[in-house]
Each structure stands twice: as C-alpha cells, then as structure tokens.
C-alpha cells in the first residue's frame, strides 16, 4: 500500500449516492478537447448516416489513430470555433441502425479500427500513443479521489465480467516485458492473475494516475508509459466479448446544484443538456468532469467526454460581494486557514463558481507544496511554466505531469493562475521541439 499524505480533499456538498438511474438521450457527441494535439481529417459530413463504431475522423499527426462514433444515427453538426478550430461532432441517435461488428482476432488492429486505441494516453505528454509504439508499462486507474467522485468499485461491480476481460486483453497486447499495473482504493477491483495491483490511500490526488505512475515507475523522455481508466477497460472488455463497441457508460451527477445526486447510466458521449433535464437547479453551472479540472458543459461542448466519469453542478454565482475581503468567511473553505471556517470546521461547504479574487504575481506560499505529493519543487515548477522556461521545467519534472495534476495548485493559488492550461501549453511546446 502507498499512503499519500500531502494533498487536499475538498469538503464539497452534494456527494452522489450509489443509486443507478437509467437515463436515455436523443443525441451524443465527441469532443476534440479529449485529444490533445489533435489535427483531424474528417471522414464524415453533416447528414451522413453512421453506425456505432464507424470512423468519424483520423488524427493526421498520428496516422491510423481513429475516433469512432459512440452511437448509431446521423451526423447533425460538425462544430468549429475561432479560425475553424474543430470543437465537436453531434450525432442524432437512431436505435434501428445496428452497430459495427469488429474482428477481435488481432487485438491491436481491433483496438485501432474500433477507435478504442485512443483510450490509452501516454506519460509524458498525455497524448494518444503513436500507432506502432510500445510502452514500458501500462497503468490502469481504478481509483478516484476527485471531489464528488463515486468509488470506481460501485461501477465496476455492475460490469465485473467486462472489466476482467478488459484487463486480460490489455495484459496480453504485448509480451510479458510490458507489465500492467492496476491501482485501487480500499477494495481490490479484480482477481485477474497477471496484473500488478497497487493500493493507494490518502488525500487527493492519490486517485490520479500521474501520482500512481510517479510512485511506481516515474517517466522520462526515454521511458514512456500508457495509462487508461477503469471505464475504458470495461468498454474494451465489452468489445472483445461481443465484437461491438460499448454504447453506454456510467457517470455520476453531483454537486449543490443537483436535486438528487446519483449515478446515471446513459449513452456514451451523451448530450448533457438532455441528460440533466429536470435534475438540476436554476442558475447552476454544469461541469463535464471534476470541479477541479472539468470543462463548462454548454452549447456545442455539452457532451459527456470520452474520459469523463462525473458531471458536477455548482451554483453559478460570479457576482462580487461588497467588502467580501473583510468578511469572516464562516461559510468559505480555505486550505490556508484564512477564514473563520477554519475554527468552526463544518463538514461540508457549499461551493459556487466565484474565484474570490483576481490575478496577481505568484507568491511563494506553503500551500503549493502542501498539496503536491510528488517529489517536485512545486513553487519553482509553477514559476517555470508560467514563464515558459521549458528547459527548467523539464529539469523540475514537468514531463511527469498532466493538467489534472496541477488542479489543486490552481485551487489553492492566491494569485488565481490557471496552471492546468499553462501546463498544457508548455507540454505542447516541448512536444513540438522534440518533433
């Protein structure tokens, strides 16, 4: 067991129950934001009919890396932003159209053709692996310590056979020289024999795969590992059992803005507006993913992402309060103990979307180190990435990180920096220089 002592569990109200509700939607989508570095070559047009598993686009920077349709129906929208940047694809579902059938005899080819190869991400760089590459190890994350996240075990138990099958497939993709590690918290998720199970306990970010990789097999430019989430393993198990991609997934719905926080079983890539209709309160902000590192789910971005296991909903109260800085803060959470709440110590806080401050220079305060469990000089690293000193950043350990690993640093930052976006920009610069 590996115990993580540094970090922070945010005491946010609205924890979902383990009740599972089946919720149907009329449309699904695919988000470009799920695939860093993506340069798509479109293989469909608006109005085309697609089967679940049909190819939607290929990453021209990684030939053979396909993103496929999460459901059967017709392409209703291909959404673009500024400078025609690709944002998302929307598909109106039609249950009468049968899904694609895949040949599973060649595991690697099956994963590539089905689009499930894109479930893997690399460390360093947090990208889909280059087709034909081989990792030093594969890490399966069956542990989640994000705020409002339900235990993966509560979902795996509904899909145990698929999860076990997925682990077996992944462990046999390469020769035995590529070990497969599976993290868990409290309860072992499977009894598959050829998997190295690692128990992680402690505060968030104990449940992030970056933390698990750091304490198991740290990465470098010469040592690359692949990572994958537990629901993606379940989907792979389903594919190799049935020959079809998995059309549904589980996503928890939690936060103060939800009437009845619970787990929803819905279509993969579900339209979040349709999924949450009648379930959330007025004047709420819907976040696809964690409150720490999710994206605002609105307009053409309102879909459950490929790697999202939760939807978080907070009261959207961004208006400034007069003399808020002088208030005792009995209902505000502070990692630094700056408010009266540090003495009252309520068990849960009602969080909203206000950031309670504005941008200013980085101040070297203890919270950065206190929430960073990795063997990294946090303050120095943050300064390096803000100034885009990539050489210093590499020396300080930036290659071990993905944006989610700096979410707590952004949360405790009195200077209100978005370190996750800044880190991604640095990783892109380093990757391009290497290329």
What are these regions (language model features)?
Residues 38-45, 154-155, 414:
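A short N-terminal beta->alpha junction/helix N-cap motif
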Residues 34-38, 50-53, 62-77:
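Generic structural motif
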Residues 52-60, 95-99:
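Glycine-/proline-rich flexible loop or hinge segments
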Residues 1-43, 58, 90, 197-200:
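N-terminal, Lys/Arg-enriched amphipathic/low-complexity engagement segments
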Residues 65, 72, 78-435:
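Buried, small/hydrophobic-residue-enriched core segments of structured protein domains
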Residues 44-53, 79-82, 243:
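Acidic, glycine-anchored pre-beta loop/turn
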Residues 50, 56-57, 264, 272:
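Generic structural signal for buried aliphatic residues
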């Amino acid at each position: 067991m590996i115990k993580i002592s540094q970090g922070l569990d945010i005491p946010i109200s609205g924890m979902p129950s383990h009740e599972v509700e089946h919720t149907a939607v009329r449309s699904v989508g695919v988000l470009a934001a799920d695939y860093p570095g993506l340069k798509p070559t479109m293989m469909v047009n608006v109005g085309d009919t697609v089967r679940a598993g049909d190819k939607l686009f290929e990453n021209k920077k990684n030939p053979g890396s396909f993103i496929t349709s999460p459901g059967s129906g017709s392409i209703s929208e291909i959404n673009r932003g500024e400078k025609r940047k690709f944002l998302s694809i929307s598909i109106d579902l039609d249950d009468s159209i049968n899904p694609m059938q895949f040949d599973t005899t060649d595991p690697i080819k099956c994963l590539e053709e089905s689009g499930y190869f894109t479930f893997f991400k690399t460390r360093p760089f947090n990208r889909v692996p280059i087709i034909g590459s081989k990792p030093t190890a594969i890490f399966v994350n069956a542990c989640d310590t994000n705020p409002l996240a339900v235990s993966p075990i509560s979902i795996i138990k509904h899909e145990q056979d698929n999860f076990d099958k997925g682990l077996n497939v992944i462990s046999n993709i390469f020769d035995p020289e590529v070990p497969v590690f599976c993290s868990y918290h409290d309860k072992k998720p499977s009894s598959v024999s050829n998997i190295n199970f690692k128990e992680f306990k402690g505060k968030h970010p104990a449940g992030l795969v970056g933390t698990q990789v750091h304490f198991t097999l740290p990465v470098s430019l010469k040592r690359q590992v692949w990572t994958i989430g537990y629901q993606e393993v379940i989907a792979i198990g389903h594919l190799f059992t049935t020959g079809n991609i998995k059309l549904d997934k589980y996503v928890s719905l939690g936060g103060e803005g939800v009437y009845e926080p619970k787990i929803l079983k819905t279509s993969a890539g579900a339209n979040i507006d349709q999924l949450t209709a009648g379930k959330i309160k007025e004047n709420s902000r819907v976040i696809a993913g964690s409150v720490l590192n999710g994206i605002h789910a609105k307009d053409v971005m309102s879909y459950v992402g490929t790697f999202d296991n939760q939807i978080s909903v907070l009261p959207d109260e961004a208006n400034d309060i007069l003399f808020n800085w002088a208030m005792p803060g009995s209902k505000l959470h502070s990692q630094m103990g700056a408010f009266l709440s540090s003495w009252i110590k309520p068990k849960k806080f009602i969080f909203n979307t206000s950031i309670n401050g504005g941008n200013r220079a980085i101040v070297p305060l203890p919270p950065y180190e206190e929430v960073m469990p990795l063997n990294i000089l946090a303050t120095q690293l943050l300064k390096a990435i803000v100034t885009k000193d990539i050489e210093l950043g590499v020396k300080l350990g930036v290659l071990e990180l993905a944006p989610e690993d700096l979410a707590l640093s952004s949360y405790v930052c009195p200077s209100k920096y978005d370190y996750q976006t800044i880190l991604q920009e640095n990783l892109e610069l380093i990757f391009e220089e290497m290329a």
